[in-house]
Amino acid sequence: MSISKEEVIKIAKLSRLELKEDEVEFFSAQIKNILEFVNKLNEVKAELLEEEYSDSTPLRKDEPETSLEVDKVLLNAPAKRLNMFEVPKIVDAN
């Protein structure tokens, strides 16, 4: 599939781009390559792709794991209180 220089100029105009003549030729070739690649993708059989696709996420077993120690977690906290991160108040009490 090819794209004409006029089509590239039209696309550039719609995109509010000003292209020089050598850029028109360059982008014409680039768009042609992209369209050829898209055509190749369209040729791929959908049945082969559907086998690899799953619309659900496999679940892992819910097993307890060791977590980080509170002291280590709060080492780099700018402010802490009662073993928790302290953050600035953003909601007025009234």
From Swiss-Prot:
Top class in the EC scheme: ligase
GO biological processes: glutaminyl-tRNAGln biosynthesis via transamidation; regulation of translational fidelity; translation
InterPro entries: Asp/Glu-ADT_sf_sub_c (IPR036113), GatC (IPR003837)
Keyword Flavoprotein included in the entry's annotation: no
Top-level taxonomic group: Bacteria
Ligase is among the record's keywords: yes
A single MF term (Gene Ontology): ATP binding
Family: Belongs to the GatC family.
Complex and partners: Heterotrimer of A, B and C subunits.
Role of this protein: Allows the formation of correctly charged Asn-tRNA(Asn) or Gln-tRNA(Gln) through the transamidation of misacylated Asp-tRNA(Asn) or Glu-tRNA(Gln) in organisms which lack either or both of asparaginyl-tRNA or glutaminyl-tRNA synthetases. The reaction takes place in the presence of glutamine and ATP through an activated phospho-Asp-tRNA(Asn) or phospho-Glu-tRNA(Gln).
Name the UniProt record assigns to this protein: Aspartyl/glutamyl-tRNA(Asn/Gln) amidotransferase subunit C
